[in-house]
A protein has these predicted regions:
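Short boundary segments that mark the start of a structured unit
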Residues: 1-194
Length: 194
């Protein structure tokens, strides 16, 4: 796809028969594009991925037809997960994706961060926020939702005491300690009862 193009044809020189150019002579011809302007779609290789080290998915931005210049696809992120904390492109944030002139697709990695914090399953919504170059546009609203499945166990709470008996005198005390089996991503409140 190149869009409509123009060709300007002019007289370069005239020779023979005593003829000469009458002023500056040129004609403009419009070449009407017969291809539709390309549209961009966004897909992902799977909609769920475990938070295990080394796992990744492939995001693909695809043009419906070739463009004669680079097409830049601006990426947006949302969901319950946080880009650069819960996932990256393997080295950092998922940047704009560029489909080079003459090509129809480009890819980016989606790599979850394997941490030791229990967060539960999280979602990442990767969307197209804009398209520029090659007269291309987004095909409707393009977004993919990825579930990052938690690989840590939900934390459990244990209760311990510094002593099992205490004197009833003034100033006597003992310490109760509530311990989580692993780190949680939010405060955990332990309500005590007697």
């Amino acid at each position: 796809y190149e869009g409509n193009e123009t060709a300007i044809i002019s007289i370069g020189s005239v020779s023979g028969g005593g003829a000469s150019e009458s002023g500056t002579q040129s004609v403009t011809i419009t070449i009407t594009e017969n291809e539709s302007a390309p549209t961009v779609t966004l897909t992902v290789s799977a909609t769920s991925i475990a938070e295990n080290a080394g796992s990744s998915l492939t995001l693909t931005a695809t043009l419906s037809g070739k463009a004669d210049e680079d097409v830049t696809v601006t990426i947006g992120t949302a969901g319950t997960s946080t880009e650069a904390t819960d996932y990256t492109d393997g080295s950092g944030v998922i940047n704009d994706m560029t489909i080079s002139a003459g090509n129809t697709s480009t890819t980016a990695n989606f790599t979850p961060t394997d941490d030791s914090v229990y967060e539960g399953n999280e979602t990442a919504i990767i969307s197209i926020d804009g398209v520029s170059g090659g007269d291309a546009s987004e095909d409707g609203t393009q977004a993919v939702t990825i579930t990052i499945t938690e690989n840590e166990s939900a934390p459990t709470v244990t209760l311990a005491t510094s002593a099992t008996s205490i004197a009833e005198n003034a100033g006597s005390s003992l310490t109760l300690t509530a311990t989580l089996s692993n780190v949680a991503d939010e405060d955990v409140t332990v309500a005590l009862s007697t």
